[in-house]
Every structure is written in C-alpha cells, then in structure tokens.
Swiss-Prot record:
Keywords: ATP-binding, Cytoplasm, Decarboxylase, Gluconeogenesis, Lyase, Manganese, Metal-binding, Nucleotide-binding. Its main location: cytoplasm. Its cofactor is Mn(2+). This is Phosphoenolpyruvate carboxykinase (ATP). The gene is pckA.
Amino acid sequence: MLSNNIIRQQLIHYGITDCCELIYNPSFEQLVREETNHNLTNLERGTITNSGAIAVNTGIFTGRSPLDKYIVCDNDTHHQLWWSDQDKTSNNQPISQITWQYLKKLVSKQLSYKRLFIIDVYCGAKKNSRLRVRFVTEVAWQAHFVKNMFIQPDAIDLISFEPEFIVLNGAKCTNPNWREQNMHSENFIALNLTEGMQLIAGTWYGGEMKKGLFTVMNYHLPLKGIASMHCSANVGINKDVALFFGLSGTGKTTLSHDTNRALIGDDEHGWDNDGIFNLEGGCYAKTINLKPELEPEIFQAIRCNALLENVMVRADGSVNYHDNSKTDNARVSYPLNHIKNRVQPVSCASHASTIIFLTADAFGVLPPVATLTNEQAQYYFLSGFSAKLSGTERGIISPVPTFSACFGAAFLALHPTVYAALLAKRMNIAGTNAYLVNTGWNGNGSRIALKDTKAIINAILNKQIQDTPTIKLPIFNLSIPQILIGVDSNILDPRTSYINSSEWQNKARSLAQLFIKNFNKFTLPLTCKKLHNAGPQL
C-alpha cells in the first residue's frame, strides 16, 4: 500500500495541500462508521436501513446535470471530439485551458486542509485496456459509492499503484464566476482528457463520478479499436452472450439480472478481439417501485455495503420503494459480488451472439419485438430512440420522443458513427443477431407487462424466435413474429391494440417523420443510403 507521504506529494501535484488526515482505500466497515457519524450533517450523513444498506440524499441533484458538463478543448481534442457547438445533441461543451485552471483551483482549494478519502480503482476488467483511476473526496459516502462501482485492486497492485486518471470531487464548492465564463450554472463537471483529470463541483449526485469515467473510456477505447457500449450484458450456460442496450427506464438493468444467466455487468462494457468485458465492478440500479417478486436479484442485493440514494426511509428503518416524493430516479449501488449468479472471477466473456435494443415507446406504434437486419441494427443503434409520457401514467396523452445516439449520447466523446462502425464490425465478425424490444405502451394505453417482455427475451435467447413465422409491419418495415411461447399473440402486432387501425397508421407516420428528421444529421460514409433505407419509409 502506498505511504501517506507519497500520496500527500501526489495531492500537492493536483493542487491539494495541508490535508488534516488521509483515509486510503478504507474498508466497507470503516466507511459505514464514517458516513453514519452523528457529527455529520445534511447531505454528508447516511442512515442505516433495516436491510443493512446505507441510505443517503443527494439534495436537489437527483440525476445527472448534462448542461453542466465541459471538456477542455486543446490541440489533442479539438479535431477528435464530438463537440456540442457542432451538434446540439452532444453534451461535450468546450472550455479553454484558462477556464480549466480556474476551476481546478476552486476544487483543489475546497479539498485542501480537509480529511480526505482516497480511493484507487480500475475502470475496465481487461488488464491491457483498463484505466488506473484515483478518486479524491471529503465525503465518506462518495468514497463508498466509488468502492461499490469500480474494480478494486488487490493488495499487491496497491503497493505500486500509479493513477493514470484523477477525479477530484469537490461537491461542496461552486463557481462564482460562471456567468463571466459563459457557463450554464455555478455547478460543473469538467474533464481534461489530455491532463487526465475530472472535476466535480456543486452536484452531489453519485452518478456523475461513474458517468464521467464512462466518457473517458468512450474516448480511450475506440482509439484502440475497442467498441465501448452503454449496455448491460449476461451469459447463458452455453456461453452465449447477450447485450442489452437502452436508455434509462427501458429495463436494461432489470432484464439483464436473470437467475438463469450469469451477469457480466449492468451498464458499461467494452468489446475487443477476445470478447465482452465490464468496465465496472458494481451495479447502479433504479429502485422506484422495486418488488422482490419481480426483481429478486436486485432486491436481495440491497444489504450491507449497498448504498441507497434518495429513497424514503421509514421510522423503523424500512424503505418505501414506491414513494417518489424525492425523485423517480432513486437508485442503489452495490458491488457485483452481491449478485449470486455472476461471471467469476472477472467480468469477461466471449463475443456477443445476441444484441437487444430496448425502447420504451410511449406512442403505441412499435411492436413488442422485431428481428433486425444488419442495416436496421445500425440504424436503430444510431437513432437510440425511446419516449416518455408528459401526461398521466395511463393512456398515451403527450409522448415526448428521445433520440440519444448509441443509446448514450450524453456519454459519447467521439462522433456517434465511430461507435456504430466499431459495433457493426464486431457484430459482423461474430455473426451477432439483433432485435428491437419495446418495453413501452400499446395503443390502449397499457404498458407491456414485464412478464411478457421477459417471455420475449427468453424466446430470443433460446432462439425460438428464429423459427417462428413473421409478418412485415408497414412504414417501419420491421419483421415481427406471429407467435411466441408465453406471450399473448394479440400484443405482438401493435395495430391490434387499436379499435381503428387507421389510428395506428397516423401515429406511425408521425413517429416515422421524427425518426427520419433525426437521422438526417448522419451524413458520413458509414451512414450511406442503405442505412437511411433501413429506417421507416413514408
């Protein structure tokens, strides 16, 4: 283990001086004592729930702040990155080196003269591509989050651990000069990919630490020819690997936690010449409306060492997972070893045989499942479509479409077509089959039942879907099965959920126009005419 003197010298290099005490890679037991200390107040203090998990609040920041994300634009990144001033769907807002230095001084000043938690971890399960990362924070539960979410080095590795990337979390400080610097607010998440550092200020949301590193890996891995993906992954007893892509709320985590399949990871993965590997060492699952009978793997993972965010804790220490008074984005982080059926000892597996693109369509247009051609797979990957309701929960009143390239535009460092090309290459080599699965709503305003979605996933993974007759869905030209075991055949064709089929036709045309408008921005060689033709046609 590194000595305190060495770490203090390294902190000085980051601009952090005169630390009162350093707590280096503490155990979970020590972190629990620290984060539940009665002398702590407000957002620093955690509560022990009756499951043994710690519950914390993140204040007004119950989700990511994409408008407060910045990356230093320098000679190395200027021509490589997908910048927001070139495409408004990118969250990569450029800042100058001068602004960066100012922000760095703010955060380093905040962390100076403090008791600090130093956590050294790996991002990436593959030794030849993993990143050595150091997190520095003054908040115990933030250190707990990091320990849950990333891969822990062993004692031997820690003796000579040399971080390649530094994360300074100064959640307690803000930027008083944000207006003069043309920034969105006093809060910021800033990355310097050349220097190898991330700064966090103003926001307490734990996910900023996790997703900041994902952006970093989305920069480094593709430049090495490795596909980086916002997806969950699991593997069957026959070593068949499935990837689940999808935006938040589409079921990515829920559907990949399967008692019959070993979990590789729930959110971030790479795909190299050897196969699939996890970038993380933990899971970050939504807990709203969590029920043990529907999501038993996640429910049983909430125990000692798990960290709950923004849940409602009752006086007796129990948690009300149905209370969304704080946020619909209540979450829990826990280490992968909380999942009994997981890939061991490292989160790696062979090449993917199946890819499932999850969408939660609130328009009532898309089918519960469709088989995709190679071109359609690239089209829907680049589109990254989902939708949510701005009206009531029941009934499709005012769908809000979301197009997030590669099902993770907020985390991409390079242009989306770079990731699409790498994924297409890996799929072609491995002979991967792709499917579109809609976990959203049908024409009568009912959400597709989880039991039906799970039966659809089973039909895909056991290859039953490959032997069933199909029909073509007009406008979108999607191949949909006519029958699947365990699934009500009446829901497979979305048109049957409408009393008047012309109503589906009208909604389908409206949604198709949105797809076409969104995809028109992709004009590079990869997205040639055949990819445009793979989408809906009017």
